[in-house]
Structure formats: C-alpha cells, structure tokens
C-alpha cells in the first residue's frame, strides 16, 4: 500500500517550495517506548495521542524573505478559493488585548532547590559510570482564563521568542504552542540533516556584554566537550540510515543568537540509503540526543525517574512529510501546552560531570524566559 501511494506522486524538480501536499506529523516524547520496547518511563499527563499522522491536501506557504504567499491544493482550484476567503475574513477581524488583567497566574514551579537536587543526582550517575550527560528539565504550571486565546499566546510568543521552527497545533481540547529553535531531522533529495544545539549562555544587557558572553561560550571547555559528545551521538544515529562513509559534520560549533540566549550549533548530514522510509528515519533519530543525553536509552530512563511526570509534547516533534518522501521535523523545546485553563511549559539543560547546580538552574530560567515574557506581557502576576 505504501508503495502504491508513493508512486502516485512525481517529484517536481522545478519547484522551490518545500511542501506540495503530504502529511502532518506530531510525535509525543513517550513514543520512544514504541521505538525502544525495553524503556519504561512515566506516561504523558496530557489528553493527547502519542503520535499523529494527518493527511494534508491543502497548505499555505509564507515566504517571509520574498514576501510572497502561496496557496496550494492537490485537489482543485475550489479549495484554494476557500483558503483565500478565509484569509479575507482574518484581515477584517479585529483583535483586542482588553480585559486581560489577572488572567494568568502561576500555580506550580519546580523549585530551584528541587531542580538542583536532581542535577546532583545526574552528576552522581555520571560518576558511577552509567551516563556521560543528561538533559534534565524543569516544569512550570499556570492557570490561564479562557478569554486568553491560543492564537494570542502564540502571537506573543512569536514576538518574545522568535525562532525558525515555531508552530501551533490544536488536537482536540489540547493546544501545543511552540517557538522551537531546533531541527530534529530534514530530508531533501536523499540528503538527510540534523542540527544539534548544545551549549547555552543568556543574552547580555549590552552589545559588549553580548560579545563577551559569546566568546566565553565558544571557548568553554565544558560546553565544547558536551557539544562534541552530542555531535558524535547524532552522527551515530544518522549512520543507521545513511550510506557508508557519507555522514559528515559540515558545520561545526557556530554561535546562533536568539532573543534570550546564545547557543552552540552544528550541522550533521549524510546521504540516505535507498529504500529507507520516513518511519525508519524517525526510529533512528527520535527523540533527539540533545534533549535526552548520552547514552540515549539509559539517560531516558534516568530522566523519567527524576522528572517523575511524562513530558508529553515537550522534546517530542512536529513537522511534515511531503508526497515524495522528503520531510522536515523539529524538536519541541521552548513549547507551551494548554488544556482548558491549564498551561504548562518546561525548560532543560545538559548536565555533565563538572556542572554547577546553581548555574544549571539559571540556564533553565534563561531558556524559559521568552515563554515567561510572553505570558507576562499578556498579564502575569
């Protein structure tokens, strides 16, 4: 059946558009228990399926650089007319920020003491020789009044924490609101890429301080060692689905700056083996090593033990697979999950042998800052 479906679509070499119809993909973090059957971790606390694959026959693509909007349909011009009419309605819709005071309040946050206690436990596991690095996360929970729309939360997050792999998805009564900076994996014309992020510093209050923080980050032996470890993990993951000898690091340890943090980023690529299907690619790389640790399976088990609550969408993925098998999938970090009046978010960081617990807690706050600022701008007391 899969082969018949794939044969219906021909690759259009003339198009520059990444998507001309295909499938939308959502993967919850707990999908790892289906990929690695021996892993047992806490179940997701959210009313969401573990994974979704939804057929998408119509799409809107916004080329921000060229300032062009493309309306796409596999079926008919009538579908495009419907999309166009929807856009006209949106253009006439008025937005308001009135009556939002006292609309958001924090109800729970993993305390600094609690987080630092678990950082120390990760370090203990490292010295016991069980792991080399683990990406421990910290939880914030809020009550948000219903008059605050999901779209408003997302629009504010796009302002306070603009990122290249952002998205909003409504699934039943749940909404995932993400401003992720990280790609898990992409595939185009048999070239597969992953772009690991590991190593963080907060943005400086002045230009000079920003430059100094970037210099300190890229020269940090701790951060470089952690990053190299995770690049090797990603190379190993890609090697499972790539032609022998084709995997390479084509961009090594560059600084990328976002609204609230600086990151060290690399790019790992390879040539995919013939007849490898999207499911095999996902099984090879999911969940990403940068948000679990090394070795991946043991880290996932330890993180489940320490965090105690399932992650759900956090550090899962969303993205697309197009009709001829190419794909682009993110890692759901800098992400909020909303269900009714309940809203939660997580932020984490990599723990290594010489980690300082207080600094690791500060890093989670720097990473959460864009999301917290979005809530505060609406009204956060």
What kind of region is each of these model predictions?
Residues 1-381:
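Extended alpha-helical targeting/anchoring segments
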